[in-house]
């Protein structure tokens, strides 16, 4: 665990040292809702930046910044901390180059340069931001198009009308203004600190995930909610559009059933029926009829990842099947149920991460996605001990605490291959789980966990005012020795005196679940960590359960357990390992070890933070082997 206290030393990854500024994180940013490659423009790269004391756009900018790296990151080229009393500005001119624009626009216009005023009324431009920390406003040609608060969540906005009314024939100006209070406010901040030391690290700010411009039809698919049921082998799916045209009742029919002898058309009520399925054609319109094509499952672990950064898209899972054997019709903006019994039934596991790819057509729109059949549950074994189960079989989850910090990019990986390397390396070392620690990654990280077979425990990002270390660290550690907790009603002790801050945390928790819930690799939601900003734990646990009952919940990782959720979550860095009273929940040791070894040329400061310094790798291995032996002895008793 490294302590980073500023910009004294620069430490680069192999990928960061060789980064191509013209091809930065160029992979498709949203694998769970993928349109054709010619439907979007990646806006990563060189932007102008400026720091100001005023909230007014600067007349002059300070220089160039490499987006999406935060100005505090070495790879940004800036190496400057945004302070709470400052504003950070980004700006670039987006040029309508014939080589940049989607092919459909090229064909429609057939002119050069592109004339924004002749853009078809049946098309929309959507600008996407993967994440901007913490609060931002977005401007197109000086006109504000949206604001967003929440430094870890994606957002987008339709800029079509602004472009039509203000853009020139060849370009438009895109400006982003950022305000980041870091750890001086109640907003979500993770482990960021303006005074990094110990377990808290360098604060970063601004744009830190991909920015991209997408071209979509007038009526388009905004999101897909996929809820596969492992036990019933049924896929519940909802295709959410930007249209207000919704229906409550729907039955579907497959292509195979259409051709079957018992499939017939009743002309009187324009109804097609076949077997158990019926589709009411009089309820369908050109704007709400969807076509879902599902492929048989396959494993995509061996997608090549040794290409150059510019070519390494890792999206080949959508190209393996030339056609989908099963097709279903339905209506958008309402849940439909699709039995999967006519497909090959393959369960997702870390060893066999089968994925079902599928496509959805809605009018002129076409997207691709995937799902998996798996279920995570807590079930009792023959000795009446609660166990974490995958597909109703106990699975011992051996994981690492993945904090998602990069020495050269901070929150932002230098490239997609770096994410893959991390996941594959952990698997090669015998780990089958990563606990994503109080950070939300870009969507491609979860996609790689899905296809590579890595289980994820997802933390909610902590927030609240300044924490009281004597309470949430020192006293809590001592109390854990005796399995003592306390009520979370004391908002002043838990840094939760702000009512707005409490509401914001609940809102962002629900948004996190909404954003990530389609990823099959995610097994658990971790609501609070070590009492940081903890409040109303059992109430929030119920809200999380209502939002997603397909995963188990660790409501309080470490200490201040309120007796709810599915996990008795233990942190133990200092004491002999043991289990306490018998639980109806599963026991999990969710943090331990923390041993450190300084490796020459692999540290950014002269200090190292951890829970036991090791002189060499031999001592480090010896300590971990001793700890693992203790852990193994507790597995039969419930760990």
Protein language model features and the residues they cover:
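Extended acidic/polar, glycine-enriched regions
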Residues: 244-258, 286-380
